[in-house]
């Protein structure tokens, strides 16, 4: 569990839900990422009160490293047969870990993930599935899933279970990708991934969620920075550092060409339009939007971003 400036009532709900997990053999590793609004001395009593069924340990980063790096350090430090990653504001159903563990063993998978109920700030359920609030979120199962996973993830960190040895072999994480995206991609390259339609957590959707769709995108400039420049860095890192077979190398090479073409097109090089369209299979919606971007009034562009956030398109 990585913690940063937690809302204490949400944190307690999360911890309470961990404490009643029916899976019998747990150990909780907690790292506070140098919180600025909540002191470690405030967090420790909540942990002590809520976590009584299994051992835990807590440590503190001397400077803010971000959740990706914090989860990387926890992955390096933790011991066990499986790792489950935990947010600070969700609620896990009691059978979450036992169902995921049974599935990963039965299916001989590298990673298993579940769907989730969506709740709001007040804990009220607003959707029975993540797919109801994210139109393009499609769960997949099986082998050979890297063809699209390099670009788009479906396994949320708070809802997955991964074999510990596989997670450790994935280190260091891609510094430009969300940790759950990279772990899922790494596992897909090694073997089978299983997605369960059954929701096993109550995921709290709010404006501060790190991986919320189009978080931080407000205009063309922020769109380019978050949805294009960051993705270019992600796939370049994979292309240069990820060990894989020739088939995946080709996918990463063409994916990098597509991303770099998008980046140059947005910067004014309209000769890249054909290349964007050539590789549109990676994301038809993004390709269409960005080809049209130079001709869209700013108000229309912002309306499209708003509509995408609201799951209308």
Task: Go through the PLM ranges and name each one.
Residues 1-216, 307:
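Nucleotide-sugar donor-binding/catalytic module of glycosyltransferases
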Residues 150, 177, 189, 193, ...:
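C-terminal subregions of glycosyltransferases and related glycan-biosynthesis enzymes
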């Amino acid at each position: 569990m990585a913690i940063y400036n937690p809302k204490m009532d949400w944190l307690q709900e999360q911890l309470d839900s961990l404490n009643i997990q029916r899976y019998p053999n747990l150990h909780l590793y907690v790292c506070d990422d140098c919180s600025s609004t909540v002191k470690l001395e405030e967090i420790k009593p909540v942990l002590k009160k809520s976590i009584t069924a299994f051992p835990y340990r807590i440590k503190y980063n001397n400077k803010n490293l971000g959740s990706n790096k914090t989860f990387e350090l926890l992955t390096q430090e933790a011991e066990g047969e499986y790792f489950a990653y935990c947010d600070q504001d969700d609620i896990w159903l009691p059978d979450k870990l036992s169902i995921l563990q049974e599935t990963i063993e039965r299916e001989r998978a590298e990673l298993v993930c579940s769907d989730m109920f969506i709740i709001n700030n007040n804990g009220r359920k607003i959707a029975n599935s993540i797919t109801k609030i994210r139109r393009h979120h499609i769960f997949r199962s099986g082998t050979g899933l890297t063809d699209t996973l390099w670009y788009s993830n479906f396994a949320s960190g708070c809802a997955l279970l991964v074999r510990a040895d596989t997670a450790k072999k994935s280190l260091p994480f891609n510094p430009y990708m969300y940790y759950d995206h990279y772990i899922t991609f790494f596992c897909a390259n090694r073997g089978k991934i299983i997605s369960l339609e059954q929701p096993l957590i109550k995921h709290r959707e709010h404006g501060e969620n790190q991986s919320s769709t189009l978080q931080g995108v407000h205009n063309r400039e922020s769109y380019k920075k978050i949805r294009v420049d960051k993705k270019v860095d992600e796939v370049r890192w994979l292309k240069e550092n990820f060990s894989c077979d020739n088939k995946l190398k080709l996918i990463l090479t063409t994916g990098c060409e597509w991303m770099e073409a998008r980046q140059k097109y947005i910067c004014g090089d309209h000769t890249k339009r054909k290349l964007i369209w050539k590789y549109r299979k990676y994301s038809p919606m993004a390709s269409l939007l960005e080809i049209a971007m130079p001709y869209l009034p700013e108000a229309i562009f912002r309306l499209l971003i708003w509509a995408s956030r609201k799951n209308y398109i």
